[in-house]
């Protein structure tokens, strides 16, 4: 028995047509698909091997590297699948967006490596772990025990002697993998998944007393196990699952276990999801936390969500997972109204959400109210409005462990207009205003232009400019500085399909910052307002920053599921003392001193059933 769903994007109308006709706001999906029964089918065992060979030339380190490996896939039945990779190479994967983050909270980057993306659904233990969100409201960072971007990520930090040094570039280079294997399947009402990955040892270049040396660090081993029981008696969906992860390293092991439960009423109007988890970091600290979320479909197009979460200060899932912060108790809520066929407009989505939060010491560490409204006019133009409000609170993170301080009441507002994206030429433009942590102002302007003359070619230009007065950044110990800063963020993206089998893609993203020191502050010894002080002794805190990614990527499908990749990558992450630098000076400084300047050729060919 199968459930059938067909969908087609109608470009000139900017609509998606489907059968059965299911709206994006529907609370049920799989259970309402068109049922089809197919008889006399004998599923065939499937297997495939994808051997590859790659050569890369690193023009920064003047090294040429050869790499040979294979991906493999075996499906002995429709209920079991085994996949793996040996000596993988991910050099041809599309680059991440460029982000300069000087705060204490980590930026989440979605997974783009195909091996880790495929078959990942069983390891998604709650809606909070699903990064494929939609809608006008800002869902925030995910809460997930399995963030595969940790695998083959940056090396672990090293303890160095006073005369030893390692550049930031070396600590940002990815770690190679020896291999990985993944098993997913189902038996009756049980779904399961097993996953393991193994990093190679890594040599990190550095200096000791000015002499070049190599520091060797062993790689980490990763393991994930997932089991979930699902039942849909009387039309209501119930599920209970366990998810366990392990990261093993000579410096210490990190073990995390979570239990999750899910419930959906037969009419799809009430959905409950919950997860509790515990972490054990090398037997030295054990933490606990969890959350419960409720979603209520009040009527067609109207949804109310409520969530409660608690994480103690010892919970740490970030060796393999992603959690923006621990030491937190938070209540959050959202109310979403989606309307269509308004007569004077095609559709509208209204989103009102907010949260209140305190840490385990009882300090009020944050709250916010966000209002978003996306209006699509009958000519397919779109107007987007966002308004935010943040009351006074304590910041216990951005001192990087040096104390807790007060932040001011803040407001922000932004509006954006986008022309119909069904035309050959389309554009968008917006303006925003918000207040800084201590009350300064932040003004931004952004927009873009897209040219799509036919189905084979597209060109996109995006820009963002910001002027900040009062940007608060931690410096060292208990010292903080506010800056007058300007930020310039242009990006270019070009796609050209020579044919259905050949594609050329070029992307350029750059972030440039000019920040001049303004006022100087000291974090109090007990939670309270920052204390304004004279400039501490030492060099100027003013700085410039250039971060860039340029990628030129050619792909030729020489046979089904077999590809030739030719890729050029150039990246920069350059900090410099701010003098009379222009943005062109800052861009040139990063371009001429790249962290990556690599040419890659990779051939991958499929053999199998």
Residue ranges and their predicted role:
Residues 1-30, 34-40, 45, 49-55, ...:
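Outer-membrane beta-barrel channel domains
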Residues 176, 274-609:
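Exposed, low-structure sequence patches enriched in small/polar residues
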């Amino acid at each position: 028995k199968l459930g059938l769903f067909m969908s087609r994007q109608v470009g000139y109308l900017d609509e998606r047509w489907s059968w059965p006709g299911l709206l994006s706001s529907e609370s049920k999906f799989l259970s309402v698909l068109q049922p089809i029964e197919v008889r006399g089918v004998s599923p065939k065992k499937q297997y495939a091997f994808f051997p590859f060979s790659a050569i890369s030339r690193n023009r920064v380190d003047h090294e040429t590297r050869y790499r040979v490996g294979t991906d493999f896939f075996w499906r002995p039945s429709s209920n079991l699948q085994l996949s793996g990779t040996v000596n993988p190479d991910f050099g041809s994967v599309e680059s991440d967006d460029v982000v300069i983050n000087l705060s204490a909270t980590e930026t989440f980057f979605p997974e783009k490596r195909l091996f880790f993306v495929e078959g990942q659904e069983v390891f998604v233990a709650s809606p909070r772990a699903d990064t494929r969100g939609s809608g006008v409201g800002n869902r925030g960072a995910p809460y997930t025990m399995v963030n595969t971007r940790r695998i083959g990520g940056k090396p672990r930090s090293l303890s160095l002697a006073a005369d030893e040094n390692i550049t930031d570039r070396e600590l940002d280079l990815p770690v190679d993998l020896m291999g990985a294997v993944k098993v997913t399947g189902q038996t009756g009402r049980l779904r399961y998944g097993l996953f393991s990955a193994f990093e190679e040892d890594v040599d990190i270049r550095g200096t000791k007393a000015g002499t070049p040396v190599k520091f060797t660090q062993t790689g980490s081993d990763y393991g994930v196990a997932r089991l979930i029981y699902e039942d849909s008696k009387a039309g209501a969906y119930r599920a209970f699952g366990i998810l366990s992860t392990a990261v093993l390293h000579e410096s210490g092991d990190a073990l995390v276990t979570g239990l999750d439960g899910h419930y959906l009423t037969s009419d799809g109007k009430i959905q409950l999801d919950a997860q509790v988890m515990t972490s054990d970091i090398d037997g030295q600290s054990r933490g606990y936390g969890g959350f419960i979320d409720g979603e209520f479909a009040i009527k067609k197009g109207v949804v109310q969500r409520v969530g409660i979460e608690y994480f103690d200060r010892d919970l740490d899932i970030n060796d393999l997972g992603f959690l923006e912060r621990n030491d937190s108790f938070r209540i959050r809520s959202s109310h979403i109204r989606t309307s269509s066929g308004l007569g004077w407009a095609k559709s509208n989505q209204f989103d009102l959400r907010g949260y209140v939060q305190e840490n385990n010491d009882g300090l009020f560490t944050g709250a916010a109210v966000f209002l978003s409204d996306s209006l699509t006019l009958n000519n397919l133009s779109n107007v987007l409005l966002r308004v935010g409000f943040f009351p006074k609170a304590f910041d216990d993170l951005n001192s990087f462990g040096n104390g807790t301080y007060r932040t001011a009441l803040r407001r922000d507002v932004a509006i954006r207009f986008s022309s119909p994206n069904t035309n050959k030429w389309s554009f968008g433009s917006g303006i925003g205003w918000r207040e800084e942590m201590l009350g300064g102002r932040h003004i931004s302007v952004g927009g873009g232009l897209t040219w799509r003359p036919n189905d084979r070619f597209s060109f996109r230009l995006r820009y963002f400019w910001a002027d900040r007065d009062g940007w608060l950044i931690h410096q060292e110990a208990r010292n903080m500085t506010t800056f007058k800063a300007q930020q310039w963020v242009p990006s270019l993206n070009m796609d050209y399909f020579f044919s259905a089998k050949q594609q050329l893609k070029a992307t350029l993203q750059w972030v440039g910052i000019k920040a001049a020191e303004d006022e100087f502050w000291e974090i109090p010894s007990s939670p309270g307002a920052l204390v304004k002080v004279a400039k501490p002794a030492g060099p100027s805190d003013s700085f410039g920053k250039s971060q860039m990614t340029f990628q030129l990527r050619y792909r030729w499908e020489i046979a089904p599921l077999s590809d030739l990749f030719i890729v050029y990558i150039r990246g920069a992450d350059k900090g410099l003392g701010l003098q009379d630098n222009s943005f062109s000076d800052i861009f040139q400084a990063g371009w001429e001193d790249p962290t990556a300047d690599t040419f890659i050729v990779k051939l991958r060919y499929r053999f199998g059933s």
